[in-house]
Amino acid sequence: MDIRVEGGRVFVGDRFEDTSVCANDGKIDAIGTEGSAALRIDARDLLVLPGVVDIHGDAFERQVMPRPGVHFAMDIALFDTDRQVLANGITTVFHGVTWSWEPGLRGADNARAILAAMEELQPRLGADTKFHLRHETFNLEAEPEIIDWIDRRRIGVLGFNNHLPAIKNDAPVRPAKIAEMAQRSGISHDAFQNLVSRIAKCADEVPGSIERLSAAARANGIALLSHDDISPEQRRWYRSMGCRLAEFPTTIETAQEAASAGDHVVLGAPNVVRGGSHIGWIDAKDMIARGMCSILASDYYYPAPLLAAFRLAADGVTTFETAWTLVSEIPAAAVGLPDRGIIAVGRRADLILVDVTGGRPRVVATIVAGRVVYLAEAARIHGGQ
């Protein structure tokens, strides 16, 4: 169906214009031209923006397991998550699925189940939903299966995570973290500690596994991310394997190393909205002001990317036009999706209509590949003329 979004203030390229956007067959085929369409959308008094491209978020886990030990069916969880992301302007979402050495929510069976459910439900989901495999690097037994997934292009992006340091013997938050992870895993405290001790003995095998997985991803054109880099040296090591996205570097020096080499630095949009990291790490607004953050992700809260872009502009950290690229154009390009993230002829018709009159931005409509998948004000829809 062809669609015409008319009367809005449209973010075209790098500036706003009072114009219309026409889409046909899932792509933008005209900007600013007059004409009819099977479906017209009245965007008066609204901003028309490229949809959010969210490359890192695990908030969907709350729909899978809203309380420890309380599980819901995967299709229920994914459909509910889909409604949430669309209502918050996210048109492309990478669900960050952790496959850890832990059992339970982040274990092998759950990772397989989520991937299978996503593949089965994809045609019925509104958002373009992709799989971000967050591989715990000490999960050595998973390597052959992950390489198979990579070779079959079942993975959208591959992230390298290592949360073992947070629960090693000298970690200051160890007792609380172990209690949290044991509860999530569904095993006793003592059993979890024994598991940690056994896994930690495999440290010498981890670098080789990361190198093999990186090579497989590069061969298949799959973007690589490293999570919680602790030092410039670690960032350089990951970069040497083609990993050019640094997620949540833990120090300013590490973020600076990444940015100075042209790597993307991914930080959490909730960090911007809340005014700082919830665990006391680097401040996202400060990093953006210093040119050391190029991508914002929802992390654990789907409303955050939309809110963060407006917050950055309101606080004078950067212009809104620049802020919006942090949640749309730049993340799309960084993970190999140059067909979206910007409103231009020939690009995917992934658009959101946003009302900014009430003090906070509110998504009125979400369009994915030229299809209206979320609408809060039905009176704005009209038949073709």
Annotate each predicted stretch with a short phrase.
Residues A43-I114:
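Metal-associated gating/positioning segment near the N- to mid-region
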Residues G51-I55, V93-H95, T129-L133, G156-F160, ...:
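Hydrophobic faces of well-ordered beta-strands that scaffold small-molecule active sites
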Residues R152-G156, Y238-L245, S260-V266, G291-S294:
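Glycine-enriched alpha-helix->loop->beta-strand junction motifs that scaffold or abut catalytic
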Residues A219, D263-N271, G275-V356:
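His/Asp/Glu-enriched, well-ordered alpha-helical/loop segment
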Residues W99-D229, D299:
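Metal-coordinating catalytic core of metallo-dependent amide/deamination hydrolases
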Residues G8, V21, G26, D45, ...:
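Divalent metal-coordination and catalytic microenvironments
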Residues G8, I28, E329, A333, ...:
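C-terminal cap of metal-dependent C-N hydrolases
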Residues M1-E6, V10-L49:
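Histidine-rich, glycine-flanked metal-binding segment
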